[in-house]
């Protein structure tokens, strides 16, 4: 009897890539994917603990899965950042968890499972060669019916931002060999992906030299059957400038800049142990729009960091008004144990953080409404992601999968992965309605 697994993925696209590394490992060891958690013999939860709300979601997901386990007599496996950060807590407080391991072992998941449960090895597993060979063509994609894939170029981070806990459990920056990146990209494309998103904690740190970074991106873009290449997590510095210029020279690279600024106040950036300042960020955004016509920008800000004053929030408001980024993500600062930020006096109340976030969000929504108005009647290059509630879910090249806007089109004949043009007809607060043309 073959043993089935299911992977629940929490957190960011980097976790999706890690989950698919596990997926591939489990297939190689003879396990079969299940369609639903309750149908699996082994339910993996790939966890997130980047901020407090992510930790709370992880705990709730584990506890809910523990209830399913009791009803279905399955094994519960907790992996990733939460398991790396809180192994003692899992061991002592969540006895329903049968196995847990941290980051860095995703590609060994199948072997770890067989070692933990020796009764599975090897006679209890049915090695379905045709299934295995088909899935060996796959890469790190969360759902193989989707026309996009995430490929990790590195893990860990050397930046040392004072608010970030990630280096404590992901470790120092460690890049993937170029051959591995190309292999994973080709596997994903053969599995049906039209779009590849390169992800990491710090993409521009790759190679520690801008020419090595640019060479890696060029070689991925040169893969013949790749339609769209999207670059994610670009730290705002000089190497990002060079990447932006490469975007302008390379048609396959999506017209999209994701660069998380986290703040624009020089005072707060210094306390965060981050480089840059408002005028440099403005120049960076202007350069991107200049060299890549039609490009749209996604950035993020952490609100309520220790020492933040109303005038620092005003700087963010002015920056957004001046640069008009199309996509803005706002995080309420939550001190993470083990970071330098947690050692600072917490000067902003939760109520005040919410007030400031709402102020910034409302201001950006006014700008976004004007941006939406300018999109009406315009036609964009787009890709079909799937069908949902009787409509095609279409995504402009200016929007990243799973985190940006989509366009709903009344045409269920559109197949996932189809690339063409969509005209924008109307909009909601974020998403849009359109016509495939």
Swiss-Prot record:
GO cellular component, one term: cytosol
Major localization class: cytoplasm
Leader peptide range in chain numbering: none
InterPro entries: Elp3/MiaA/NifB-like_rSAM, Methylthiotransferase, Methylthiotransferase_CS, Methylthiotransferase_N, Methylthiotransferase_N_sf, NA-bd_OB-fold, Ribosomal_uS12_MeSTrfase_RimO, rSAM
Matches recorded under PANTHER family: RIBOSOMAL PROTEIN S12 METHYLTHIOTRANSFERASE RIMO, RIBOSOMAL PROTEIN US12 METHYLTHIOTRANSFERASE RIMO
Function: Catalyzes the methylthiolation of an aspartic acid residue of ribosomal protein uS12.
GO biological processes: tRNA modification
Record field: transmembrane: none
Protein name stated in the entry: Ribosomal protein uS12 methylthiotransferase RimO
Ranges for domain Radical SAM core: 143-370
Reaction equation(s) it catalyzes: L-aspartate(89)-[ribosomal protein uS12]-hydrogen + (sulfur carrier)-SH + AH2 + 2 S-adenosyl-L-methionine = 3-methylsulfanyl-L-aspartate(89)-[ribosomal protein uS12]-hydrogen + (sulfur carrier)-H + 5'-deoxyadenosine + L-methionine + A + S-adenosyl-L-homocysteine + 2 H(+)
Natural source organism: Leptospira interrogans serogroup Icterohaemorrhagiae serovar copenhageni (strain Fiocruz L1-130)
Keywords: 4Fe-4S, Cytoplasm, Iron, Iron-sulfur, Metal-binding, S-adenosyl-L-methionine, Transferase
Cofactor dependence: [4Fe-4S] cluster
UniProt key word Transit peptide: no
UniProt similarity note: Belongs to the methylthiotransferase family. RimO subfamily.
List of residues binding [4Fe-4S] cluster 2: 157, 161, 164
Domain TRAM: 373-437
Superkingdom of origin organism: Bacteria
Binding site for [4Fe-4S] cluster 1: 12, 48, 81
EC number: 2.8.4.4
Phylogenetic classification of the source organism: Bacteria, Pseudomonadati, Spirochaetota, Spirochaetia, Leptospirales
Gene3D superfamilies per record: Methylthiotransferase, N-terminal domain (3.40.50.12160), Nucleic acid-binding proteins (2.40.50.140), tm_1862 like domain (3.80.30.20)
Domain MTTase N-terminal, first and last residues per copy: 3-118
Molecular function as annotated in GO: 4 iron, 4 sulfur cluster binding; aspartic acid methylthiotransferase activity; metal ion binding; protein methylthiotransferase activity
Compartmental location: Cytoplasm
Cofactor note: Binds 2 [4Fe-4S] clusters. One cluster is coordinated with 3 cysteines and an exchangeable S-adenosyl-L-methionine.
